[in-house]
Amino acid sequence: MEPAFWHKRWADNQIGFHQLQVNPYLQAHWPALGLAVGAQVLVPLCGKSLDLLWLAAQGYRVLGVELSRRAVEDFFVEHGLVAEVSRRGAFEVWRCGEIELWCGDIFALNAEDVAGCTGLYDRAALIALPPRMRERYMALLDDLPAIGKGLLVTLDYDQSLIDGPPFSVGDGEVRAGFSGWQVDEVEGREILDESPKFLKAGVERLLERAYSVRR
């Protein structure tokens, strides 16, 4: 999954993964994590998600990481926010109030960059990555010791019937990748009837799961 793939998706406005409302799992299950108000939350591969605004509105500081500059720029423009832009290492950092979006490759992050992040929210990062990149991504999260609590959303389906993204990430893979964490499935829902692309491909089950992760 090369960066050019995602740059083209954004350039062509092929962003079906972008949700037009705040994620219901986030609203339902984030409060139960008990993350202190004022804490900083890492949101990998954040796009221009409305979830960023929701987290900030709950009193959290938000650090999103996004490869596409188009997505970052669109986020601020579409919400009438004026960002200060600076550089930090390999990243272009856009900041307005309690929201920072770091434009660059997620794998260029290190523990020092996100030392202030104690929370994690991943709705569309893990499922955006093919298997080997998922391994790298989960290893990266494991190497960010400040992060202690988070919410993760996945999809589980027969990958042989249709190519990702979004990719299928089964329960076993989540628990293996987060082996040093306490992993609890907090909600699971069958969403095949809402997903014409998967129905057309002959997929018979499309399970969306939300997990809390803690360590």
Protein language model annotation of sequence segments:
Residues 1-37, 48-52, 64-99, 103-113, ...:
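Class I (Rossmann-like) S-adenosyl-L-methionine-dependent methyltransferase catalytic domain
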Residues 41-44, 101-103, 120:
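Extended hydrophobic secondary-structure segments that form protein cores and membrane-embedded regions
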Residues 42-47, 55, 125:
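Class I SAM-dependent methyltransferase "Motif I" SAM/SAH-binding loop
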Residues 46-48, 131-132:
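Short beta->alpha connector loops
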Residues 57-61:
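Conserved S-adenosyl-L-methionine
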Residues 106-109, 118-133:
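A short SAM/SAH-binding and catalytic strip from SAM-dependent methyltransferases
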